[in-house]
Structure formats: structure tokens, C-alpha cells
């Protein structure tokens, strides 16, 4: 990928990758820590990737030609709260790299943007 996708296409592409039987997911350490901290599980991430929506513009990823997208969704384990997942898709590899997972209601109260977080670690 060399050009970022708009929100609608990003939603469709991420959902398509997430539903592909060849899907491979990697989790950055930060994402694994946030999942544990928030009491969320892998199936919550999969649900959000398969059924969520991208509403925000992407940010460049550290991997050249790739971009970070935030996909948002309520999940079976999140109660009435929505989660946001910052993900770097690699369509040709059928790979989704999870950078972080957040509660959107907490994110909206904090200055700054997690989508700007580095996806290196």
C-alpha cells in the first residue's frame, strides 16, 4: 500500500482482511498490555476488526508505505462501551498489526491522539 485509504475503503479493507481464513495478526507489546489492563480478550479485537468502522484519517506507520487506522466498535465483552483499535493493515500479506486497544470514552477525555503513537514497540 502506498496511498492511504479513505475511511470507507479502510473499513472495507480491514474487515475483508479480518475475515480472510489466511489472516495473521501480530500484537505490539503496548497492545497486549492494554488488552490485559482493560480486561478485553482476543475475540473482542477480532469482533471489532470484522464489524467495526474507521471514522478518522490515517497516520503514517513506521513501515514505509503503510498507514495506521483506528477502527471502532462495541464488542461482546465491552458492555455498552466502544473500543478503538489502532491497526496497521498489510493487505498483500493478509496481516493486521495491532498497535493499541483503547476505551473510546477514555480516549475522548484525554488530550492528544493515540493514533499518533509509534507502532515500533
Which residues are covered by each model-predicted region?
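Ribonuclease/tRNase effector modules and their secretory precursors
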Residues: 1-121
